[in-house]
Curated annotation (Swiss-Prot):
UniProt organism field: Hydrophis schistosus (Beaked sea snake)
Chain residues that bind Ca(2+): 28, 30, 32, 49
E.C. designation(s): 3.1.1.4
Top-level division of the source organism's lineage: Eukaryota
Name of the molecule in the record: Basic phospholipase A2
Lineage: Eukaryota, Metazoa, Chordata, Craniata, Vertebrata
Broad class of the protein's primary localization: secreted
Active site, per annotation: 48, 93
Record's subcellular location: Secreted
Length: 119
């Protein structure tokens, strides 16, 4: 679920950045999404949106499903997740969080005018 996703993000970046920093970033981080991602970090969000979309096509509810994950020294990983939907959502969240941690955060892409820049 979205609360767990925020913890997974914090785990992946080792507490260097709040998950809230990603809630209104670029064209795809946060609610909705359209146009071309503004950078690699925004592309991570588009991939995550697409991953949730695939989960929904499989009959899953990614924004509400709970899953078991572990935050280790190498970052988050899904743990003992046997149900198909829960596993899919956990995999989506961990992949996105790791993608966030790998890519630079550009403050200029926070809270952008999506009507102008996301066409």
């Amino acid at each position: 679920n979205l609360v767990q996703f925020s913890y997974v993000i914090t785990c992946a970046n080792h507490n260097r950045r709040s998950s809230l920093d990603y809630a209104d970033y670029g064209c795809y981080c946060g609610a909705g999404g359209s146009g071309t991602p503004v950078d690699e970090l925004d592309r991570c969000c588009k991939i995550h949106d697409d991953c949730y979309g695939e989960a929904e096509k499989q009959g899953c509810y990614p924004k509400m499903l709970m899953y078991d994950y572990y935050c280790g020294s190498n970052g988050p990983y899904c743990r003992n997740v046997k149900k198909k939907c829960n596993r899919k959502v956990c995999d989506c969240d961990v992949a996105a969080a790791e993608c966030f941690a790998r890519n630079a955060y550009n403050n200029a892409n926070y809270n952008i005018d999506t009507k102008k820049r996301c066409k």
